[in-house]
Amino acid sequence: MASAPMPFTLTLGTVSFFLAVIWGRPLINLLRRWRIGKQIRLDGPNSHQTKMGTPTMGGLMILVPVFVITVVLNFANFLSGFAAGRAFLAYFGFEHGSTLIGKSILVPLGVMVGFGLLGALDDLTGLRGRHQGIGLLARYKFAGQVFIALVTALGLHFALDLRSVALPLMERKIDIGLWYVPVAMFIIVGFSNAVNLTDGLDGLAGSTAALAFAAYGIIAYLQGQYPLLAFCFTTVGALMAFLWYNAYPADL
Protein backbone atom coordinates (compact mmCIF):
# COMPACT_ATOMS: atom_id res chain seq x y z
CA MET A 1 0.00 0.00 0.00
CA ALA A 2 1.28 3.45 -0.84
CA SER A 3 2.04 5.92 1.88
CA ALA A 4 1.14 9.37 0.56
CA PRO A 5 0.93 11.99 3.32
CA MET A 6 -1.69 14.68 2.81
CA PRO A 7 0.97 17.45 2.65
CA PHE A 8 2.54 15.71 -0.34
CA THR A 9 -0.87 15.40 -2.00
CA LEU A 10 -1.60 19.10 -1.48
CA THR A 11 1.85 19.89 -2.84
CA LEU A 12 0.99 17.98 -6.01
CA GLY A 13 -2.20 20.01 -6.36
CA THR A 14 -0.27 23.25 -5.90
CA VAL A 15 2.39 22.27 -8.43
CA SER A 16 -0.32 21.24 -10.88
CA PHE A 17 -2.06 24.60 -10.41
CA PHE A 18 1.05 26.67 -11.12
CA LEU A 19 2.09 24.49 -14.05
CA ALA A 20 -1.34 24.93 -15.62
CA VAL A 21 -1.40 28.70 -14.96
CA ILE A 22 2.04 29.12 -16.54
CA TRP A 23 1.15 26.84 -19.45
CA GLY A 24 -2.26 28.45 -19.94
CA ARG A 25 -1.28 31.82 -21.41
CA PRO A 26 1.05 30.40 -24.12
CA LEU A 27 -1.65 27.84 -24.95
CA ILE A 28 -4.29 30.56 -25.38
CA ASN A 29 -1.95 32.64 -27.56
CA LEU A 30 -1.14 29.57 -29.66
CA LEU A 31 -4.82 28.70 -30.15
CA ARG A 32 -5.56 32.28 -31.20
CA ARG A 33 -2.64 32.29 -33.63
CA TRP A 34 -3.94 29.07 -35.19
CA ARG A 35 -7.49 30.48 -35.13
CA ILE A 36 -8.81 27.59 -33.08
CA GLY A 37 -11.75 29.49 -31.65
CA LYS A 38 -15.33 28.80 -30.72
CA GLN A 39 -17.73 28.80 -33.66
CA ILE A 40 -21.32 29.68 -32.76
CA ARG A 41 -24.30 28.60 -34.84
CA LEU A 42 -26.12 31.56 -36.37
CA ASP A 43 -29.49 30.19 -35.26
CA GLY A 44 -28.40 30.17 -31.62
CA PRO A 45 -29.23 32.78 -28.95
CA ASN A 46 -27.76 36.24 -29.51
CA SER A 47 -26.14 36.10 -26.07
CA HIS A 48 -23.98 33.21 -27.28
CA GLN A 49 -22.52 35.27 -30.14
CA THR A 50 -20.19 37.01 -27.67
CA LYS A 51 -18.33 33.70 -27.35
CA MET A 52 -17.47 33.70 -31.06
CA GLY A 53 -13.72 33.26 -31.52
CA THR A 54 -12.99 32.38 -27.88
CA PRO A 55 -10.18 29.77 -27.96
CA THR A 56 -11.46 26.24 -27.57
CA MET A 57 -9.68 22.96 -26.71
CA GLY A 58 -9.19 24.26 -23.17
CA GLY A 59 -9.00 20.70 -21.88
CA LEU A 60 -5.35 20.69 -22.93
CA MET A 61 -4.64 23.11 -20.08
CA ILE A 62 -5.86 20.46 -17.65
CA LEU A 63 -4.65 17.33 -19.38
CA VAL A 64 -1.00 18.28 -19.97
CA PRO A 65 -0.02 19.11 -16.35
CA VAL A 66 -1.87 16.07 -14.98
CA PHE A 67 -0.21 13.81 -17.55
CA VAL A 68 3.27 15.25 -16.94
CA ILE A 69 3.02 14.97 -13.15
CA THR A 70 1.71 11.41 -13.39
CA VAL A 71 4.60 10.40 -15.66
CA VAL A 72 7.08 12.03 -13.28
CA LEU A 73 5.55 10.11 -10.37
CA ASN A 74 5.85 6.92 -12.37
CA PHE A 75 9.52 7.66 -12.96
CA ALA A 76 9.97 8.40 -9.25
CA ASN A 77 8.44 5.01 -8.53
CA PHE A 78 11.10 3.50 -10.78
CA LEU A 79 13.78 5.41 -8.86
CA SER A 80 12.59 3.83 -5.62
CA GLY A 81 14.57 0.77 -6.65
CA PHE A 82 17.79 2.72 -6.09
CA ALA A 83 19.29 4.06 -2.88
CA ALA A 84 19.29 7.69 -4.04
CA GLY A 85 15.71 7.38 -5.20
CA ARG A 86 14.61 5.91 -1.87
CA ALA A 87 16.32 8.76 -0.04
CA PHE A 88 14.52 11.29 -2.24
CA LEU A 89 11.14 9.67 -1.63
CA ALA A 90 11.83 9.33 2.09
CA TYR A 91 12.29 13.11 2.22
CA PHE A 92 8.60 13.45 1.33
CA GLY A 93 7.53 10.88 3.90
CA PHE A 94 7.31 7.79 1.71
CA GLU A 95 8.40 4.58 3.32
CA HIS A 96 10.63 2.03 1.60
CA GLY A 97 8.55 -0.21 -0.62
CA SER A 98 5.78 2.33 -1.10
CA THR A 99 4.60 3.36 -4.53
CA LEU A 100 3.53 6.68 -5.96
CA ILE A 101 1.59 5.24 -8.83
CA GLY A 102 -0.21 2.05 -9.70
CA LYS A 103 -3.02 0.60 -11.75
CA SER A 104 -5.52 2.64 -9.78
CA ILE A 105 -4.04 5.85 -11.17
CA LEU A 106 -3.21 4.67 -14.69
CA VAL A 107 -6.83 3.74 -15.37
CA PRO A 108 -8.32 7.21 -14.70
CA LEU A 109 -5.38 8.80 -16.52
CA GLY A 110 -6.13 6.64 -19.56
CA VAL A 111 -9.80 7.59 -19.41
CA MET A 112 -8.87 11.27 -19.14
CA VAL A 113 -6.53 11.06 -22.14
CA GLY A 114 -9.10 9.13 -24.18
CA PHE A 115 -11.94 11.55 -23.55
CA GLY A 116 -9.54 14.47 -23.96
CA LEU A 117 -8.60 13.30 -27.46
CA LEU A 118 -12.27 12.77 -28.29
CA GLY A 119 -13.07 16.29 -27.08
CA ALA A 120 -10.20 17.75 -29.12
CA LEU A 121 -11.50 15.98 -32.23
CA ASP A 122 -14.97 17.35 -31.51
CA ASP A 123 -13.62 20.90 -31.18
CA LEU A 124 -11.52 20.67 -34.36
CA THR A 125 -14.44 19.26 -36.35
CA GLY A 126 -16.60 22.21 -35.30
CA LEU A 127 -14.17 24.87 -36.53
CA ARG A 128 -15.01 24.85 -40.22
CA GLY A 129 -16.77 22.93 -42.96
CA ARG A 130 -20.32 21.63 -42.89
CA HIS A 131 -20.06 20.80 -39.17
CA GLN A 132 -18.94 24.32 -38.21
CA GLY A 133 -20.38 25.28 -34.85
CA ILE A 134 -21.62 21.72 -34.31
CA GLY A 135 -18.59 19.46 -34.03
CA LEU A 136 -18.82 15.70 -34.21
CA LEU A 137 -22.26 14.35 -34.90
CA ALA A 138 -23.90 13.01 -31.76
CA ARG A 139 -23.86 9.40 -32.96
CA TYR A 140 -20.11 9.48 -33.64
CA LYS A 141 -19.35 11.21 -30.35
CA PHE A 142 -21.49 8.70 -28.46
CA ALA A 143 -19.81 5.80 -30.27
CA GLY A 144 -16.41 7.15 -29.21
CA GLN A 145 -17.57 7.48 -25.61
CA VAL A 146 -18.93 3.94 -25.57
CA PHE A 147 -15.69 2.56 -27.03
CA ILE A 148 -13.51 4.28 -24.41
CA ALA A 149 -15.89 3.18 -21.66
CA LEU A 150 -15.88 -0.41 -22.95
CA VAL A 151 -12.08 -0.65 -22.99
CA THR A 152 -11.93 0.86 -19.51
CA ALA A 153 -14.64 -1.39 -18.07
CA LEU A 154 -13.02 -4.51 -19.51
CA GLY A 155 -9.70 -3.47 -18.00
CA LEU A 156 -11.28 -2.85 -14.60
CA HIS A 157 -13.03 -6.22 -14.61
CA PHE A 158 -10.42 -8.53 -16.13
CA ALA A 159 -7.12 -6.78 -15.29
CA LEU A 160 -8.00 -5.48 -11.83
CA ASP A 161 -10.56 -8.21 -11.08
CA LEU A 162 -13.26 -5.73 -10.03
CA ARG A 163 -16.66 -7.39 -9.91
CA SER A 164 -18.57 -5.94 -6.97
CA VAL A 165 -20.31 -2.66 -6.16
CA ALA A 166 -21.04 -0.94 -2.87
CA LEU A 167 -24.35 0.78 -2.22
CA PRO A 168 -25.06 3.41 0.45
CA LEU A 169 -26.32 2.08 3.80
CA MET A 170 -25.25 -1.46 2.89
CA GLU A 171 -22.33 -3.01 4.75
CA ARG A 172 -21.58 -5.76 2.24
CA LYS A 173 -20.62 -5.30 -1.39
CA ILE A 174 -22.76 -6.89 -4.09
CA ASP A 175 -20.96 -9.24 -6.47
CA ILE A 176 -22.42 -8.60 -9.92
CA GLY A 177 -19.86 -10.61 -11.89
CA LEU A 178 -19.66 -9.80 -15.58
CA TRP A 179 -22.46 -7.25 -15.19
CA TYR A 180 -19.74 -5.01 -13.77
CA VAL A 181 -18.72 -4.17 -17.35
CA PRO A 182 -22.03 -2.63 -18.57
CA VAL A 183 -22.57 -0.92 -15.20
CA ALA A 184 -19.12 0.68 -15.36
CA MET A 185 -19.71 1.70 -18.98
CA PHE A 186 -23.02 3.35 -18.07
CA ILE A 187 -21.39 5.33 -15.26
CA ILE A 188 -18.41 6.46 -17.37
CA VAL A 189 -20.53 7.58 -20.33
CA GLY A 190 -23.10 9.17 -18.03
CA PHE A 191 -20.52 11.20 -16.11
CA SER A 192 -18.88 12.31 -19.35
CA ASN A 193 -22.14 13.66 -20.74
CA ALA A 194 -23.01 15.23 -17.39
CA VAL A 195 -19.89 17.38 -17.73
CA ASN A 196 -20.84 18.27 -21.31
CA LEU A 197 -24.29 19.40 -20.19
CA THR A 198 -22.81 21.79 -17.61
CA ASP A 199 -20.31 23.25 -20.09
CA GLY A 200 -22.47 26.22 -21.02
CA LEU A 201 -21.73 29.02 -18.58
CA ASP A 202 -18.23 30.35 -17.99
CA GLY A 203 -16.61 28.50 -15.11
CA LEU A 204 -19.53 26.15 -14.46
CA ALA A 205 -18.06 22.87 -15.74
CA GLY A 206 -14.63 23.53 -14.24
CA SER A 207 -15.95 24.39 -10.79
CA THR A 208 -18.30 21.42 -10.56
CA ALA A 209 -15.58 19.06 -11.84
CA ALA A 210 -13.12 20.42 -9.26
CA LEU A 211 -15.62 19.81 -6.46
CA ALA A 212 -16.28 16.29 -7.75
CA PHE A 213 -12.58 15.38 -7.95
CA ALA A 214 -12.00 16.81 -4.47
CA ALA A 215 -14.84 14.66 -3.12
CA TYR A 216 -13.48 11.55 -4.83
CA GLY A 217 -10.03 12.39 -3.46
CA ILE A 218 -11.40 12.45 0.08
CA ILE A 219 -13.13 9.11 -0.51
CA ALA A 220 -9.86 7.67 -1.85
CA TYR A 221 -8.08 8.94 1.27
CA LEU A 222 -10.61 7.31 3.58
CA GLN A 223 -10.21 4.03 1.67
CA GLY A 224 -6.42 4.21 1.75
CA GLN A 225 -6.12 4.49 -2.04
CA TYR A 226 -3.31 7.03 -1.89
CA PRO A 227 -2.20 6.96 -5.55
CA LEU A 228 -5.79 7.76 -6.53
CA LEU A 229 -5.88 10.49 -3.88
CA ALA A 230 -2.78 12.06 -5.44
CA PHE A 231 -4.30 11.85 -8.92
CA CYS A 232 -7.56 13.49 -7.81
CA PHE A 233 -5.90 16.48 -6.18
CA THR A 234 -3.44 16.86 -9.05
CA THR A 235 -6.50 17.19 -11.27
CA VAL A 236 -8.14 19.62 -8.84
CA GLY A 237 -5.08 21.86 -9.05
CA ALA A 238 -5.20 21.87 -12.86
CA LEU A 239 -8.95 22.55 -12.82
CA MET A 240 -8.51 25.54 -10.52
CA ALA A 241 -5.94 26.93 -12.94
CA PHE A 242 -8.38 26.33 -15.79
CA LEU A 243 -10.95 28.40 -13.87
CA TRP A 244 -8.37 31.19 -13.72
CA TYR A 245 -8.85 31.61 -17.47
CA ASN A 246 -12.37 30.21 -17.85
CA ALA A 247 -14.20 32.40 -15.31
CA TYR A 248 -16.37 35.16 -16.78
CA PRO A 249 -15.41 36.70 -19.11
CA ALA A 250 -13.70 33.55 -20.33
CA ASP A 251 -10.37 33.70 -22.19
CA LEU A 252 -10.65 29.98 -22.96
Where are these regions (language model features)?
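"…together with the soluble PPM/PP2C metallo-phosphatase catalytic core" -> "…together
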Residues: 1-252
